[in-house]
């Protein structure tokens, strides 16, 4: 058995091996003859959490901790809880010999921890562990070459990633491993000029052995191109990295979705509720149980009545606070529990219910065989009878709605058809909106020899008394625009409000064009029915009525006098912005920052309402948001039927628009449309708002856009946008749909920003010089008709303000 002196010698040897630069701490000289000594080695990096724990026995009377022979005391970083010591944010001074002495009747047992804290340099890119070794091998290879060699890149595969986007306060490391004979020199340039340590706060470190530069705690002023210049007498080579520093945006605590989760357990069980909290500022976490007093769950102040079950103490870690332990639960414990987390920015909370049931019997009563067999027979018989009834009902329904056969010539319409219209709703909808409804009754034959629906009036629609409006009280006016299958004209409706029968209301009337097809009629009816089911909201275009009897179908909707949001913003650009505009039509309206945030807030409210009705828009953009006379934002075209399964998104169509630059990657590549894909489009719409109607991804061809999106690139921050709003855009553009915010969260955040924004905050709308720099030749005419515009359209938009087709210095994009 090893003696005490042998153990001391072994501990000193371990410490000398771990830290050659530090004097090896020695063990205490005086130890009880009965003492048992153990030594454990422990290595950690700078900034890590040190955790040292003693092994305890049942008969331990007391525990003492020492470091390098001195009693260990608690500090703001050091916490001692009996048999455990925790040191937060470890530094090199925390290295040493820690001793845990447990006193027992049989003697003292001492455990030594030889701790070594070493420095660690994080890097933007993952360097191989053998950087030092490879550098040595390169130099040996260079020196062994008899002939001179010009500089060359030793590991070009490690230099492929040129754009680096990192959060502020991170450490950045760029490497340019090179070789040559004689050994070349290394210099670093920033923005094409020599980069010296005094050019940035905190300087930088150059490690010539690994051909690298290291910058600690980067700040936004560190953005820019960094060039490594490698040269010797026989040549020179260089490589440029682009650094982008993203500022952190403070936010209230974020709680992981689905936690804590509802639980159902037998009485007497143990329950753990888990709550994952993410927060930059230090969060304060509490666990609450909702209670009732005199049958009420709320106090006189209207706030819920709660009992604090767990709160953070002086020595409690966040990890401990994220779990609530309930032991041996009873029926009285069955109630609602809440995890409440707050920081200096705000408060977040998630709740879960605990259900306690009777304990499951260990010996359940087993059915006798005859009874069990009888139940199976009855259930099987009932199932077969139900299947037969369902089959008969479906067969009769098909016969009732069956279309009459056409002749071989499709140009002759035999009869008016019943259109089974399928609603556009999200996949999780369980409402009746997902069912097919027959909206058109058969009528007499049409004598038309045209494949177009010239006899529109011969299609009889069932009258809906809630929405039917008399034709003789509707006056049609000038055209407002044309769509794929119909047109919109201005109109005046007399007595639209039944309480004011003589009042004239300006409206917009949707109708079919003269060359409309049967599918066009089906689409218009589908849009009308969708608007009926969705209902009314201030921030969507609402259905006001319809003329379905004794004539062509007219769908009456709200009129927005100021046009779509894209043109509304462009018309309010000041003359100083670089785009072709007509000075005669420049509006005198001044837009404040609060006006732009209000636009975004109203659109978010409209989309929140549509999402609550299980409606997926699929084409949210500034061109599909209309503006009323009172500058109220109203979302349009949410009821359109869009065929998303037969569109080639990589090609232009003759009359169709492909909104690829607004589409989420999962919609673009996999054709998966959800509320979260609408959130991506909302992020692009935010970018449109704060560029006053700019075209997304300016100057980027669509084929290149597909590649950039897959690589994680995103658009730059607009010049007049705050960091908080830009971070909101970036959240909307998260590659993982489930990580994007919901419209409810967007409404809450924008509501807060609107409330905190002053009305007098007018924008400095002069575009910065470096916001767009020439990247593609400018071949504009007086009107925009680019095939590379943000929406693919065969026909140009007349009199449309044009933005220069410029590209940012790095492609106008950032990588997430």
UniProtKB/Swiss-Prot annotation:
<feature type="glycosylation site" description="N-linked (GlcNAc...) asparagine">
    <location>
        <position position="262"/>
    </location>
</feature>
<feature type="binding site">
    <location>
        <begin position="558"/>
        <end position="560"/>
    </location>
    <ligand>
        <name>ATP</name>
    </ligand>
</feature>
<keyword id="KW-0418">Kinase</keyword>
<dbReference type="GO" id="GO:0017134">
    <property type="term" value="F:fibroblast growth factor binding"/>
</dbReference>
<feature type="glycosylation site" description="N-linked (GlcNAc...) asparagine">
    <location>
        <position position="76"/>
    </location>
</feature>
<dbReference type="GO" id="GO:0045597">
    <property type="term" value="P:positive regulation of cell differentiation"/>
</dbReference>
<dbReference type="InterPro" id="IPR007110">
    <property type="entry name" value="Ig-like_dom"/>
</dbReference>
<feature type="topological domain" description="Extracellular">
    <location>
        <begin position="24"/>
        <end position="374"/>
    </location>
</feature>
<keyword id="KW-0472">Membrane</keyword>
<keyword id="KW-1015">Disulfide bond</keyword>
<dbReference type="InterPro" id="IPR017441">
    <property type="entry name" value="Protein_kinase_ATP_BS"/>
</dbReference>
<keyword id="KW-0675">Receptor</keyword>
<feature type="glycosylation site" description="N-linked (GlcNAc...) asparagine">
    <location>
        <position position="116"/>
    </location>
</feature>
<feature type="disulfide bond">
    <location>
        <begin position="54"/>
        <end position="100"/>
    </location>
</feature>
<protein>
    <recommendedName>
        <fullName>Fibroblast growth factor receptor 1</fullName>
        <ecNumber>2.7.10.1</ecNumber>
    </recommendedName>
</protein>
<keyword id="KW-1133">Transmembrane helix</keyword>
<feature type="active site" description="Proton acceptor">
    <location>
        <position position="619"/>
    </location>
</feature>
<feature type="glycosylation site" description="N-linked (GlcNAc...) asparagine">
    <location>
        <position position="238"/>
    </location>
</feature>
<dbReference type="GO" id="GO:0005007">
    <property type="term" value="F:fibroblast growth factor receptor activity"/>
</dbReference>
<dbReference type="GO" id="GO:0048513">
    <property type="term" value="P:animal organ development"/>
</dbReference>
<feature type="binding site">
    <location>
        <position position="637"/>
    </location>
    <ligand>
        <name>ATP</name>
    </ligand>
</feature>
<feature type="glycosylation site" description="N-linked (GlcNAc...) asparagine">
    <location>
        <position position="315"/>
    </location>
</feature>
<feature type="domain" description="Ig-like C2-type 1">
    <location>
        <begin position="25"/>
        <end position="118"/>
    </location>
</feature>
<dbReference type="GO" id="GO:0008284">
    <property type="term" value="P:positive regulation of cell population proliferation"/>
</dbReference>
<dbReference type="Pfam" id="PF07679">
    <property type="entry name" value="I-set"/>
</dbReference>
<feature type="binding site">
    <location>
        <position position="564"/>
    </location>
    <ligand>
        <name>ATP</name>
    </ligand>
</feature>
<dbReference type="Pfam" id="PF07714">
    <property type="entry name" value="PK_Tyr_Ser-Thr"/>
</dbReference>
<keyword id="KW-0325">Glycoprotein</keyword>
<keyword id="KW-0393">Immunoglobulin domain</keyword>
<keyword id="KW-0968">Cytoplasmic vesicle</keyword>
<feature type="modified residue" description="Phosphotyrosine; by autocatalysis">
    <location>
        <position position="762"/>
    </location>
</feature>
<dbReference type="InterPro" id="IPR011009">
    <property type="entry name" value="Kinase-like_dom_sf"/>
</dbReference>
<feature type="domain" description="Protein kinase">
    <location>
        <begin position="474"/>
        <end position="763"/>
    </location>
</feature>
<keyword id="KW-0808">Transferase</keyword>
<feature type="domain" description="Ig-like C2-type 3">
    <location>
        <begin position="253"/>
        <end position="355"/>
    </location>
</feature>
<dbReference type="Pfam" id="PF13927">
    <property type="entry name" value="Ig_3"/>
</dbReference>
<feature type="glycosylation site" description="N-linked (GlcNAc...) asparagine">
    <location>
        <position position="328"/>
    </location>
</feature>
<feature type="binding site">
    <location>
        <position position="623"/>
    </location>
    <ligand>
        <name>ATP</name>
    </ligand>
</feature>
<keyword id="KW-0963">Cytoplasm</keyword>
<feature type="region of interest" description="Disordered">
    <location>
        <begin position="118"/>
        <end position="152"/>
    </location>
</feature>
<keyword id="KW-0597">Phosphoprotein</keyword>
<dbReference type="InterPro" id="IPR050122">
    <property type="entry name" value="RTK"/>
</dbReference>
């Amino acid at each position: 058995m090893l003696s005490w002196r042998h153990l001391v010698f072994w501990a000193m040897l371990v410490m000398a091996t771990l830290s050659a630069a530090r004097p090896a701490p020695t063990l205490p000289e005086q130890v009880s003859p009965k003492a048992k000594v153990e030594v454990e080695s422990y290595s950690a990096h700078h900034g890590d959490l040190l955790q040292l724990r003693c092994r305890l026995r049942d008969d331990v009377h007391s525990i003492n901790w020492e470091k390098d022979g001195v009693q260990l005391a608690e500090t703001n970083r050091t916490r001692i809880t009996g048999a455990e010591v925790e040191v937060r944010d470890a530094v090199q001074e925390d290295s040493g010999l820690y001793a845990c002495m447990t006193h027992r009747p049989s003697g003292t047992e001492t455990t030594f921890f030889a701790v070594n804290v070493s420095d660690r340099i994080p890097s933007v890119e993952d360097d191989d562990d053998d950087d030092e070794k490879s550098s040595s091998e390169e130099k040996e290879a260079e020196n062994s070459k008899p002939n001179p060699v010009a500089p060359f890149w030793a590991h070009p595969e490690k230099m492929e990633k040129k754009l680096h986007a990192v959060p502020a306060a991170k450490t950045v490391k760029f490497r340019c491993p090179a070789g040559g004979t004689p050994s070349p020199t290394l210099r670093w340039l920033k923005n094409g000029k020599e980069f010296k340590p005094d050019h940035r706060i905190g300087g930088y470190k150059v490690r010539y052995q690994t051909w690298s530069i290291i910058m600690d705690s980067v700040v936004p002023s560190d953005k820019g191109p960094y060039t490594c210049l490698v040269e010797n007498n026989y040549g020179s080579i260089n490589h440029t990295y682009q650094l982008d520093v993203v500022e952190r945006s403070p936010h209230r605590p974020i709680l992981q979705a689905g936690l804590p989760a509802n639980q159902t357990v037998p009485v007497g069980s143990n329950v753990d509720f888990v709550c994952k909290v993410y927060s930059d500022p230090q969060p304060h976490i509490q666990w609450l149980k909702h209670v009732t007093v005199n049958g009420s769950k709320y106090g006189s102040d209207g706030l819920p009545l709660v009992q604090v079950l767990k709160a953070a103490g002086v020595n409690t870690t966040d990890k401990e606070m994220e779990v609530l332990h309930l032991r041996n639960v009873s029926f009285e414990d069955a109630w609602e529990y809440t995890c409440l987390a707050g920081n200096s920015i705000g408060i977040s909370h998630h709740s879960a219910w605990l259900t306690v049931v009777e304990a499951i019997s260990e010996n359940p009563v087993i059915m006798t065989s005859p009874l069990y067999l009888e139940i199976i027979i009855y259930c099987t018989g009932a199932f077969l009878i139900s299947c037969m009834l369902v089959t008969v009902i479906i067969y009769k329904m098909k016969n009732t709605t069956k279309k009459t056969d056409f002749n071989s010539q499709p140009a002759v319409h035999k009869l008016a058809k019943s259109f089974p219209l399928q609603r556009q709703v999200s996949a999780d909808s369980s409402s009746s909106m997902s069912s097919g409804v027959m909206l058109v009754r058969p009528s007499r034959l049409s004598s038309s020899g045209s494949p177009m629906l010239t006899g529109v009036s011969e299609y009889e629609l069932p009258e809906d008394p809630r929405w039917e409006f008399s034709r003789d009280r509707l006056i049609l006016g000038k055209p407002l625009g044309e769509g794929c299958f119909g047109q919109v004209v201005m109109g005046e409706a007399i007595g639209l409000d039944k309480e004011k029968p003589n009042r004239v209301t300006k409206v917009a009337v949707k109708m079919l064009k003269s060359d409309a097809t049967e599918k066009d009629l089906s689409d218009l009816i589908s849009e009308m029915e969708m608007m009926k089911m969705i209902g009314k909201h201030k921030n969507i275009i609402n259905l006001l009525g319809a003329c379905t009897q004794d004539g062509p179908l007219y769908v009456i909707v709200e009129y927005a006098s100021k046009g779509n949001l894209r043109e509304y913003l462009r018309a309010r650009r000041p003359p100083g912005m670089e785009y072709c505009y007509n000075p005669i039509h420049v509006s005198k309206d001044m837009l404040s920052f609060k006006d732009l945030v209000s636009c975004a807030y109203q659109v978010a409210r409209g989309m929140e309402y549509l999402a609550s009705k299980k409606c997926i828009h699929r084409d949210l953009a500034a061109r599909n948001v209309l503006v009323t006379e009172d500058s109220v934002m109203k979302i349009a075209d949410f009821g359109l039927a869009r065929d998303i399964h037969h569109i080639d998104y990589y090609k232009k169509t003759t009359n169709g628009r492909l909104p690829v630059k607004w589409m989420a990657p999962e919609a673009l590549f996999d054709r998966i449309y959800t509320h979260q894909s609408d959130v991506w489009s909302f992020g692009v719409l935010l970018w449109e708002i704060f560029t006053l109607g700019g075209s997304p991804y300016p100057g980027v061809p669509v084929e290149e856009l597909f590649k950039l999106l897959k690589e994680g690139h995103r658009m730059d921050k607009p010049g007049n946008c705050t960091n908080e709003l830009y971070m909101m855009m970036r959240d909307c553009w998260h590659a993982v749909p489930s990580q994007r915010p919901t419209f409810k969260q967007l409404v809450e955040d924008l509501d807060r920003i609107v409330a905190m924004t002053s009305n007098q905050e007018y924008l400095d709308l002069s575009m910065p010089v470096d916001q767009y720099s020439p990247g593609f030749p400018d071949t504009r005419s007086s009107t925009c008709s680019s095939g590379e515009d943000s929406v693919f359209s065969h026909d140009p938009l007349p009199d449309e303000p044009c933005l220069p087709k410029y590209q940012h210095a790095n492609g106008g994009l950032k990588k997430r």
